[in-house]
Regions:
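Conserved donor NDP-sugar-binding/catalytic core segment of glycosyltransferases
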Residues: 7, 11-42
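Conserved beta-strand edge residues that scaffold enzyme active sites
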Residues: 34, 108-109, 146
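Alpha-helical elements of Rossmann-like donor-binding domains used by nucleotide-donor carbohydrate transfer enzymes
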Residues: 7, 11-18, 89-93, 127-130, ...
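Membrane-proximal basic amphipathic "stem/tether" segments
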Residues: 135-171
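Short beta-strand-to-loop acidic/aromatic patch adjacent to the donor-nucleotide binding site
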Residues: 1-7
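Conserved residues at the C-terminal ends of beta-strands
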Residues: 2, 31, 114
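Conserved nucleotide-sugar donor-binding catalytic segment
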Residues: 44-127, 131
């Protein structure tokens, strides 16, 4: 599920080939290097492993997620009515269908920060809410989670504007 400005690490193909020989899964996922616009390393991102939370959170790192063709054939392709959450929706659909996920504790890709999902958080929240409702979640629960995420996002943005944050980021 790699995007145009993301990149596979040179050893990723070999790692995946070996993992496929060891473990028969439908979806393989791993860690990722997050890089800035100049391709400088910002941090290593590891997925959260509670796949049941996929309905509300992207717990996997989509550029470091690899899906076998058979899983697409059995579960379908991306739902293009989603602009921001199509990868999360597809992975949730595969999870609900009982597809087997396998975690590889290695960095498999470089992910460029600052993409569309990062810069359109309100639209992402709205689309995520639509997705949750389409899977039968209650309106009250969906709206509550949307409010919590919005407040959390606003707090993070406020922290990023402080002098202390800028000093610590420069270290």
């Amino acid at each position: 599920m790699i995007n145009a400005d993301d990149e596979l690490l040179p050893e990723t193909s070999e790692i995946l080939k070996n993992e496929c020989k060891k473990i028969d899964a439908d979806i393989y996922y791993g860690n990722c290097y997050w890089v800035d616009s100049e391709r400088n390393l910002e941090y290593v991102s590891k997925p959260k492993h509670d796949l049941s939370k996929l309905l509300y959170n992207m717990v996997l790192i989509h550029p470091s997620t690899f899906v076998k063709k058979k899983a697409y054939e059995e579960c379908g392709l991306f739902d293009v009515t989603y602009k921001y959450c199509m990868d999360k929706e597809l992975l949730y659909r595969m999870y609900k269908a009982g597809k087997k996920f396998d975690y590889i504790d290695r960095c498999l890709t470089k992910f460029k920060a600052g993409g569309v999902s990062d810069t359109h958080s309100k639209a992402v929240f709205k689309e995520g809410s639509r997705m949750a409702l389409s899977y039968g979640e209650s309106q009250i629960k969906v709206k509550s989670i949307e409010i919590i995420k919005t407040v959390r996002n606003q707090m993070v943005n406020m922290i990023k504007e402080t002098r202390v944050y800028r000093v610590l980021k420069g270290i």
